[in-house]
Structures are given as C-alpha cells and as structure tokens.
Amino acid sequence: MSLEPFQKSSALSLGVELEMQLVNTHDYDLAPYAEDMLRLMSKIALPGAVVPEMTSSMIEVSTGICHSSAEVLGQLTQIRDALVKSADKLNIAVVGGGTHPFQQWHERRIYDKPRFRELSELYGYLSKQFTIFGQHVHIGCPDADTALLTLHRMSRYIPHFIALSASSPYVQGQDTAFDSARLNSVFAFPLSGRAPFALTWDEFTVYFNKMAHTGVVKSMKDFYWDIRPKPEFGTIEIRVFDTPLTIERATALAGYVQSLGSWFMNDQPFMPTEDDYLVYTYNRFQACRFGLDAVYVDPATGGHMPLREHILMTMAQIERHAHRLDASASIHLLRTSVERNDNDARWLRERQGEERLLAEVIRQAADRFRGGVDHEPGGFS
C-alpha cells in the first residue's frame, strides 16, 4: 500500500482525542460497557466522534476541527456532559487517568472488531495490557514538509507533554514510582518510539515505501510513534499524553501544543537535527519516571537543568503566540501547575495517601471528571 498524499489543513487547527475509562460504581473496577455507551452516545448530537477502543472497558471520544483552545473546551464540555449522562443511565462512571490503578489485565475483553481481533492475534497478551488511556492532540500543518519540520521540533518538548499530563502512577494495585507508567506499555510494541529523521515528504515517502515493501506495515496506523504524521487529516498527531483527570487540563495541553506550533512555524527558532535524538530516550524516561521533578538534557547544548525550569522558560518564550491564539488561559493553568509541582499523578498519590483505598481514589477521580470536586488551579474559569 502506498503512502496517501498529505492533505491541506488550516495551520494550527486542533483536534483532541481522549481514551476514557469505564468503571462500575460498586468497586470502581473497569467494566465492559463500551457497546452500551456507544449505543447511548449515538443518540446524542455531538461534535467529533465516539468510537470503541482495544478492550471493552474503554472508549475514545474526539472533538471536531477546532481553531482555539476555547473551542476545544466547548466541544469537550459537550462530550463530557454526554458521557456523564450516558454513564449515569448505566450506573457506571467515566474516569480520566492514563492507567486504571488496580485492574487486572488478564480480565479484559478484546472489543469485537476485525482490526482489534487482528492486533490481538499479533500481539498476544500485550493487547490486553494495552488497556491504557491516552490523549492525542492533532495540530494542522499547511503542507507536508512543514508537518515534518514541526514534528521534529516538537520532539524536543516530548518531556514537557509527558510530565504535564502524567496521570498513571499505579499499575495492578502498586505504586510504580513512575508518574507516567502508561508509556512503559507503549514501548513494548515494535513500531513505537520516535519517527525517522526525515525533513521532506519525499524522504519520508521513501522510508514508508521501504517499510511497506518488507510487509511489516500497511498504513500509518501501524506506527505507534510518539508523534506521527496523519496525511489524511493534514496534521501531526502527538500521542504521549496520559488522559488527564479533567477536560480543563486536556484543553490546556492542546493550547500549549498550538502555541508551540505557532512559535515553530512563525519564528523558526531552531533547525532540528538527527543529533537531537541522542538524548531523546533519556529525556523521555526522566519525564515518565519523575514527572515535573525530572532532569532535562538540552539536545543542542548538552546542558542539564530541571525540567520544570525548561517548561517555564519555554512558556515565557511562547507567551505572545499564546496571547495571539487566545491560549493564555491554557498556559496559565499549566504554569500554575508547574509552579505548584502539581500534576495529576501527584493528585492521585495524595488521594491514596489520605484514603488508603484505590477504589475510593477512582470514585473521587470520576467525580472530578464530571466537574464535581477539586477544579484545576488557575486557567479556565
């Protein structure tokens, strides 16, 4: 199969996908209600789409094409309210977070869809372990070469995205000591990691054709890269975010991506090189393990600095772009989070420290998702 042409899209347009947990309301374990939720959600007029995911205790929701973080928040609010309404009818709850803290992977059921059955046959138990929950952010690019240049510039900021969204400290009932343990499950797949270093669509097409010739891949869907081009949408898709506990944080992350994209496309602050990736996996590990307390190694200088300082420095650099895009509320929410050393992983650990019962933590997280408790500090009102 040949690589499809890169479609035109509006530069800096946004699309957000969220993979959500479905839990019962008696012990707050995962519950196989995807089909029922899809049936109920199909009766509600909504932007974007609601689709099944790999296992039957999760669904994916997405916005339509948006042009501002305010528009993202408006659409996610409609979708969130519909999710809550549908879940209430089924006596279940919808929860954010990158992992379910105590679910047992072997109890999961693969959703009955040909592609999911095919992946289950190929990847075995990894498919059930892939009951993890991420946020994907699409950003529109005016042409294919700009998309690749933006992709490789954005790769320097992967640790930012991981630390700011981290919400998966618990796996199988244990504190993993990682802020984002979810990504450890992604790394097990053979076509995960980072995209090849190609700065023109012609170069990328050569790479894709070579891979297709081997029979290893058939389409871009077969790549599980941290950032990948989506030629059918005219976007690049950033895939390292854990699903946040609130739609406000999900929106803020999209606003941050859009502001970075504006900085890259308008100011051309640096030219990416292959050597940027010498410290890529180290920086990614640091962010997964330590979150906002990570060390960041600057790919250009080799200098070490606290990741939180690099995030705050970057936010200052892109402030005027955020203002122009009406994304200042997004930056403010995330800046406040960094200054308070407060991400969703910390929130989950603090709740567990108080409650000593992960089921109660999930109950509170479900309430937080529906807007019931503990709103995000700063940012959106």
Curated annotation (Swiss-Prot):
The coiled-coil segments of this chain are none
Q: Which UniProt keywords apply?
A: ATP-binding, Ligase, Nucleotide-binding
The record's Gene Ontology biological-process terms are:
modified amino acid biosynthetic process
- What is this enzyme's catalytic activity, as reactions? L-cysteine + L-glutamate + ATP = gamma-L-glutamyl-L-cysteine + ADP + phosphate + H(+)
Question: What Pfam family is a match, any one?
Answer: GCS2
- The enzyme class is ligase
Give the enzyme's EC designation.
6.3.2.2
GO terms (molecular function) for this protein are:
ATP binding; glutamate-cysteine ligase activity
Q: Can you tell me which family this protein belongs to? A: Belongs to the glutamate--cysteine ligase type 2 family. YbdK subfamily.
* Protein function: ATP-dependent carboxylate-amine ligase which exhibits weak glutamate--cysteine ligase activity.
PANTHER family, alphabetized: GLUTAMATE--CYSTEINE LIGASE 2-RELATED (PTHR36510:SF1)
Q: State the protein's name.
A: Putative glutamate--cysteine ligase 2
Q: Which organism is it from?
A: Polaromonas naphthalenivorans (strain CJ2)
User: What phylogenetic lineage does the species belong to?
Assistant: Bacteria, Pseudomonadati, Pseudomonadota, Betaproteobacteria, Burkholderiales
